Amino acid sequence: MNDTVTRLQADLCVVGTGIAALNALAVASEYLEQGQQVVLIEQRAQYGGMWNDAYPFVRLHQPHELFTAGSIPWQGDRPRSYLATRQEILDHFANILDFVRARVRVDERYGWEFTEHEERDGRVLVRARNADGEQLEVDAAKLIKGFGVEVRPDTPLKFTSDHVRSIGPSTIVERRDEVYNGKEPIWIVGAGKTAMDTAHLLVTEAPGREVNMIIGGGTFFGKRDRLFPNNRWRVQATPNMLQAAVARRFDGTNEEDVRRWLREKYGIGLVPEAKNYFFGILSEAENETIARGLTSTVRGYLADVRDQDGRPELVLRSGVTREVPAGTWIVNCTGLITPVGRPYEPYSSPSGNVLTLSLRSATVLLSSFMAYFMTHLMYRDLLTTTPLYQVDYSELAKVAKPASPYVMATIAQYNLCLLSDVLPLRSFLDCGLDFDRWMPLPHRVAAVAAFAARRKRDGARMRAALDTTRDRFGVRCGPLEFV
């Protein structure tokens, strides 16, 4: 065992360098004074969080300018509607760190895994360890754990048969010639954003290949053409407005009605009766290209691939089987946002000196937004006095997956009502993540006025829906006990 211990002093320690952690870091740097010390702990070899593990052909859902930290702008002159690539996102993260380094001193510790923390004497002792067993101890005034969504790297599925080739999306690029030029069929498992990206890649770059999808219950997306139209003066509904509309409709029991309304009014996907929605965004052109290029779309869930009389066959949970040729490619596009087994931890410690950003105690829909607003609360000493609702999304997704997106939209909208009571307007105007920035200023002003006019009435209704969710499913959904 390596007994080497490095000890550091800091005004703030941040764990992680993904979009959640970087938003927390950017906001905190606005409150810290020039020259104050921040220690950044990241288990990977470089900044970027999940974007280091994402498949190479991934692109953003939203226009690139709306994916940032704090109010830090993108560099370059890409069109506003441009959907950034993985490398461009990582380059922007580097730009974010440059901005923060100009404000405060940042000690970046890559290759260190956070292990634990303890509060004592009004400060936080943070411990981490590297691959060599060396230990790091940071004595910090505040700690922000930017775990975020913690997306899993793509992992091949395991099957009984060894006569098929099971891969993840990244392997398509690594084995491009084999995949693109082979004769064996390709089966994509999944119907979310990863599956659609994978299908779009294959049908456009390997035209003529047999590409099939097993889509489970089906997934639908928000129409990018409607949510982010090229003519910004013709915006009818931004994702913010969509979230608010969902929250006003959901009463804690009617997720099927809300799903049907949302699919019919704003949705797009491969099948009309898709059951799943995860806040993804897709254009009509992308959807049409994929639908036209696929050989088949199969509803159901893949349980196994087994050999029958020496020949592999797909086995669905329903018991339906389908023979496939030996050498068939099976691309796993499922489980990337499956909650990891992290234990529950409230978003704030009783002292307010530790902020934890995770799905186990979620307060706002996306981890980036959660980090942005919760860090503002932390540095204004409002973290333990603002009665935000939290929801244990990890448990909710297990016991009530169909309701989970509508619960998340409702809790986010409800908490925005509370945040608007305690944070200055500037905190909202400076949020570079705000989807309403896609609209011209007069439209944004009108949206703010509409929100202000309805927030008291809507807030009471949303709180009742969240209380119903808690009672109905038995999940943690409500204020922290000490708030």
Language model feature labels by segment:
Residues 1-12, 30-36, 136, 149-179, ...:
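Extreme N-terminal leader/targeting segments of oxidoreductases
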Residues 13-15, 136-151, 186-189, 325-337:
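Short hydrophobic core segments
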Residues 18-31, 175-222, 365-418:
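Rossmann-like dinucleotide/flavin-binding elements
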Residues 43-95, 174-176, 214-275:
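Glycine-rich active-site loop/strand segments that organize a redox cofactor
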Residues 48, 200, 291, 296-299, ...:
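Glycine-enriched catalytic-core subsegment of oxygenase/oxidase enzymes
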Residues 77-153, 269-272, 279, 286-315, ...:
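Feature captures the FAD/FMN-dependent oxidoreductase FAD-binding
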Residues 79, 85-92, 145-206, 211, ...:
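Glycine-rich dinucleotide-binding loop and its adjacent helix/turn
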Residues 235-331:
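Long, internal scaffold/assembly segments composed of regular secondary structure
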